[in-house]
Every structure is written in C-alpha cells, then in structure tokens.
C-alpha cells in the first residue's frame, strides 16, 4: 500500500504556493482563474488522514454555521467561500489571511505585548467567540496559533510594468500600474504600527462543536491544546487516574463539560500569555512534572482534587506583578484574566459581560477606528456556496445511526447514552482511526497541535503543523462537476456469498493479578451478543481465519493496556501513536492485538487478531455498533514482554526523530 498522499486540486484555481501542512492536510495559496481572487485552499485526504470523518463533518458544519449563505460574515471569523468533496479529498476554499498568526506576532516583542495592543487583540477574539457562542458553536481550541492577522493595508507603492501582476485586496489583476511594495519581512506578515492596528480572524475549526438545542450539551471528549485546556476537561477525561469518589469541580456538576465555557478559559490563558510572554501553566505551576503530556495532565488533574490547582490560580495576580509591568492598566488586565480563569466554569465571566470589561474598552475603541480608517471600503459580502454533496456528507452519520437503531430495536442490548459533539448526534468518540485501515504505515506521526509550523504564517486554517514535514502530496486535477461524498470504507455485500458469517470464540484470555488501567472514564452495563450485532463481512474483508471474535465478550484481566487515538485522551488530540506501535510490532506474529470496550464497568475484550491489517478492519466494523473502543497490544498477556516492545518503540521514535515538542518543555517520548 502506497504511503503517498493523493489530493485532488480544483481546476478553477491556480496553485500559487504551499502555505503549510500537517497530518490532516495541506493549505495552499491560490487564485481563481477567471476573477483572480486570492484564496487559501485546504485539502484534506480523508482516506489517509489521521482525523476522523466526524471531525471533518464538525469543521464543515461549524464553518457553514458561522458563514450563513447570502449573509455578511463576521469580520473576526475566517470566511468560508466554498467547500465540497471530490473522491477522497475534502476541499475548503477559504478567505486568504495574509498577515501571519498571533503566535508569530508575539515573538516580535521581547517580553509580552503593550497592554493597549493586547486589549485591541482580545476584544476581537472575544467578539468572535461570543458570536460563535450565540450560534451555539464552541471552538474548543482557542490559542494564538489559531488566530490569524491581516497584514498592513498602507504599504508604499512602487511602479511596475504592465506585464507584472498586481496583488491588492485579495485579487490578482493582470494589467496595472502599481504593485504593493513588500514589507521588510519576506513573508509580508503584519508589522506593528500604532497608527494601523491589526484585524484578527479566528480559524481552525477542527475541534468545533455545535449544540443542537437551546441548552448547552454536555461533552466528555478531549479537545484543545494542553496549555490552553480548561481544567474541567483535564479532570473529567483523566478521572480514572484519580482516587475513587472524586472527579467533580462543583457539587452540582455533571460528568462532562459545557463546551461553551471552555472557550472562556482559553481566552483567559491567551490573555496571560500576551501580557507576560509566558505560558500560564509553566508560571503558576513551576514544579509541575512536564516530562510528558500525559504526566503533566494527570498531575494537573490530581492538583484539581487536592486544591493545589486553585492555589495556582490564586497566585496569578502576584505572578503577573512580578514582571514589573509599568502600565496604569495592568490591574485591569489582572482583573480581566482572573475573571475568566475560574476553576468552576459557572463562575467565569460570561462573554457578553467580558466584552464590556474595562480592560477591553481601549481595544473596542481602537478596533472601531481601525475599521473606519483602513477597511471602510471593504465590500466583501460573498456568501458561502453549499453543494448538495456537502449536505449529504453531513447527514451521513445520522442516517447510519437511524438504520442501526432500526436494525437493533428488538435487541436485548442495554441502551448506551452518547454525548453529541455535532448537530447530527454523532458519537463523541472522535474516531481518529477511521481511516487507519488505509494508512497503517503512514509515517506522518508528528501530530503536534500546539506548535504551528512557521510556514503556516499566512493561513494554516485547518491543521496543526508537524514537527517534520510529511511527504509531498500528489495533486490530481479534477473537475468539481464529478463530485462524490462517499467517505466510509466499502460496505457493500452484493458480491459476497449469503452464507458468509463471522467466526467467534469463547476462549477467555489469561488473567493476571494486576488491576487494569484505562484512560476512558465512561462506564455502563454489560455488552453482549457479539458478533451478532455486527454487519456482515464485506468483500474487502481480510481472511476470516485471521479474525477471532469473543462471544460473549470476556473480562480483561491483565494490567497493561495500550490505547489507540480513539479513546486515549492525550493521543487523540496530539499524536499518531498507534501507527508507531504497528510499525515496530507488525514484523512479529507473536504479539496479539485486542479490541476492548470500556463502555462496561469491567472492560471487556470482544475481538483479537495477530494481524495488524485484520485488527484495524475489525476495529472499523466494531465502531459502527459500539463506541468508544480501545486496541490493546500484548504478548501472551505477559506484562514483562511489553517492556521490550516499549524499548523498541522508543528506539524507533529516537531514530526517526519523531519526538514532538508541544511548547516550552511539553514533550512526548
């Protein structure tokens, strides 16, 4: 199977240059062949991408919600011009934002930004998030790298010949007299000018969530970047590591979090970094074990329980004052930050009130002045185009769920409740392994969502940058007239013999005396009747003799369980760990892969195989019925053998330089 990424390019656009890339896709600067309009085109390979179909659906749904057809788009929200599906490529035509990211801009200051400039930037960011929340949309990954800036609008002009192109206001004109003179920086990023403050755009909606009713839905899936992640997410997702009987931030809190409130926390964390130049967590918890992301987050979760986290939050005012900032508005800035960084989500200042906070008063004034002086004639009112294939794609999971519910309506399987991360009641497991059966050996495992590649300064609106670049994609030109929204693996059984059925085994695995450890916090009643609940094998199924289903499922008794991206709270967002495991282990048949459900109070093993391709195929079959699932790896269920496996994996990571830095000292090994 080829590891080469194949992406289809829309024929109506000229490819100017690549802006940035990540494991989820590539972003290009392009121009429309007829109009010359400059755009950013994001291409996502749905066949090999490390993100799930649900995540792509969520991003499309969020962009469509925030870019209503034939209506003016909010100035601080990235504009969606068009989106469609062609074969295995999701294509996003987005507004081209040319001034780099707020993350890049921060580094032009030695230590923190001027408070008036911070107020200007935060007012726009809060304005955008408040608008999103009014649409029942939460971003869930607010950070400086996901906030873009328009570059300066008043550069010097210089003469140019008629043969040269003119780039002005987002268009290429093929006959003209003048050309905008590039700034001193080669990339034309926004450069600080007190007479022309920047316009910001919130982007990257890969983890966005849409609530389907008037009341905010409760979520329990991990989303966001560790340095800006709200404590309720850390605490709830990692609750299995904590002592029994704990796991709630307040007496009336439920087992989940309100996604509309996590954005408020993120804004506070961003404000802290803009003022001090340092990350919140590193400052208020200087002794935190940050050897790995997992270790750091588990320790933070424990600190929430024992009260140390609250002590860290209480230290914020004094920590900010230690920077010796000489500005009369510094106390207003401290008040602004502490009103947002509240441990109890319900005590955080609502966004509507945040917009009226005294610290943002100067920002509101400067933002209004900037619009009047430099964007008064901006008449970009293009509406988003929504082809029918996108509507079909967004409804795909809902239709599948309805069919499954109809098929299993007479089953004795207990009801399992799922939280809705999208408007169409999608399961909240965020199955990042949805396409792994087509990408088992993909080497693009540096999925760092917290550190944007500096090449993404113009418009990395979609993907976290990789710490090492994936292989260049093959761009196939194709006409949008032959669009297709088929995303899922083939499930047709027309060519299969009618007698083809799953085989099963009741042989239990060997148990140990150690208690199992799982990252999933979700528990419910027993699950039985496998594999009767499963759809029949498809024509592309691996040999049935390589599959072994447990019927009924058996309890898992060994203590070490390696999880996939699907339910692993850390790796789901940041790292493609499963592929690294498979690359090392696949050469040996002595290791057994297991599919485990953590929906039950006692984890159950429901399938095993010694073949990596088979286990991934079985995994994609299982997740259509029950989620979330885990894939475990062991050798004859001997815990000691795992150590040699781990050593091999660490060696592999070291030789391939796959170690990923997540910010100041956040490292995964």
Curated annotation (Swiss-Prot):
Residues 13-360 form the Protein kinase domain. One of its GO terms (cellular component) is cytoplasm. Its EC number is 2.7.11.1. Residues 396-405, 419-449, 457-494 have a biased composition (Low complexity). PROSITE patterns: PROTEIN_KINASE_ATP (PS00107), PROTEIN_KINASE_DOM (PS50011), PROTEIN_KINASE_ST (PS00108). SMART domains: S_TKc. The active site is at residue 141. Pfam families: Pkinase. It comes from the Eukaryota. Residues 406-418 have a biased composition (Polar residues). GO terms for molecular function: ATP binding; protein serine kinase activity; protein serine/threonine kinase activity. PANTHER family: SERINE/THREONINE-PROTEIN KINASE UNC-51-RELATED (PTHR24348), SERINE_THREONINE-PROTEIN KINASE ATG1C (PTHR24348:SF68). This is Probable serine/threonine-protein kinase DDB_G0291918. It comes from Dictyostelium discoideum.
């Amino acid at each position: 199977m080829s590891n080469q990424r194949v992406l289809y390019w829309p024929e109506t656009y000229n490819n100017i240059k690549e802006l940035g890339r990540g494991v989820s896709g590539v972003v290009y600067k392009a121009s429309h062949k007829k109009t010359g309009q400059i755009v950013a085109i994001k291409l996502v390979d749905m066949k090999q991408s490390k993100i799930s179909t649900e995540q792509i659906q969520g991003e499309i749904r969020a962009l469509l919600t925030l870019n209503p057809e034939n209506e003016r788009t909010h100035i601080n929200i990235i504009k969606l011009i068009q989106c469609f599906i062609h074969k295995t490529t999701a294509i996003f035509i987005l507004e081209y934002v040319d001034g780099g990211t707020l993350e890049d801009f921060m580094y032009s200051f030695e230590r923190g930004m001027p408070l008036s400039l911070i107020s200007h930037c935060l007012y726009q960011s809060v304005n955008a998030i408040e608008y999103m929340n009014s649409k029942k949309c939460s971003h869930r990954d607010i950070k400086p790298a996901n906030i873009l800036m328009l570059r300066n609008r008043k550069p010097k002009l210089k003469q140019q010949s008629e043969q040269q192109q003119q780039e002005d206001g987002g268009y290429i004109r093929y006959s003209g007299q003048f050309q905008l003179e590039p700034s001193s920086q080669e990339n034309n990023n926004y450069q600080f000018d007190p007479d022309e403050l920047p316009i910001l755009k919130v982007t990257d909606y890969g983890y966005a969530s849409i609530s389907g009713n008037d009341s905010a839905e409760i979520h329990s899936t991990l989303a966001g970047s560790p340095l800006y992640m709200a404590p309720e997410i850390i605490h709830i997702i990692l609750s299995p590591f904590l002592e029994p009987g704990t796991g709630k931030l307040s007496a009336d809190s439920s087992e989940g979090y309100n996604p509309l409130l996590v954005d408020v926390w993120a804004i506070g964390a961003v404000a802290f970094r803009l003022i001090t130049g340092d990350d919140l967590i590193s400052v208020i918890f200087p002794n935190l074990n940050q050897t790995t992301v997992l270790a750091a987050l588990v320790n933070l979760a424990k600190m929430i329980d024992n009260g140390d986290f609250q002590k860290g939050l209480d230290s914020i005012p004094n920590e900010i004052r230690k920077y010796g900032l000489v500005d009369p508005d510094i106390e207003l800035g401290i008040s602004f930050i502490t009103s947002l960084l509240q441990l109890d989500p319900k005590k955080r200042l609502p966004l509507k009130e945040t917009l009226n906070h005294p610290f943002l008063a100067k920002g509101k004034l400067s933002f209004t002045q900037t619009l009047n002086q430099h964007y008064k004639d901006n008449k970009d009112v293009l509406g988003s185009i929504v082809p029918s294939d996108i509507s079909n794609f967004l409804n795909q999971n809902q239709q599948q769920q309805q069919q499954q519910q109809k098929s299993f309506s007479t089953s004795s399987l207990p009801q399992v409740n799922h939280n809705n991360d999208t408007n169409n009641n999608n399961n909240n497991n965020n199955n990042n392994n949805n396409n792994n059966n087509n990408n088992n050996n993909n080497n693009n495992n540096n999925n760092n969502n917290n550190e944007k590649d500096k090449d993404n300064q113009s418009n990395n609106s979609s993907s976290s940058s990789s710490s090492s670049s994936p292989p260049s994609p093959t761009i196939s030109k194709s006409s949008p007239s032959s669009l297709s929204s088929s995303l899922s693996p083939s499930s047709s059984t027309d060519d299969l013999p009618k007698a083809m059925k799953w085989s099963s085994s009741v042989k239990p695995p060997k148990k140990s005396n150690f208690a199992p450890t799982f990252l999933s916090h979700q528990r419910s009643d027993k699950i039985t009747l496998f594999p009767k609940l499963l759809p029949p094998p498809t024509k592309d199924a691996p040999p049935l003799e390589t599959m072994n289903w447990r019927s009924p499922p058996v309890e898992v008794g060994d203590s070490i369980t390696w999880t996939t991206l699907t339910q692993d709270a850390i790796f789901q967002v940041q790292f493609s760990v499963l592929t690294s495991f498979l690359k090392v282990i696949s050469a040996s048949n002595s290791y057994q892969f297991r599919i485990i459900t953590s929906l039950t109070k006692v984890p159950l093993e429901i399938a095993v195989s010694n073949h990596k391709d088979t286990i991934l195929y079985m995994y994609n079959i299982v997740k259509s019925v029950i989620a979330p699932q885990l894939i475990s790896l062991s050798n004859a269920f001997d815990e000691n053998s795992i150590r040699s496996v781990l050593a091999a994996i660490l060696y592999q990571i070291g030789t391939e330089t796959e170690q990923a830095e997540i910010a100041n000292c956040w490292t995964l090994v």
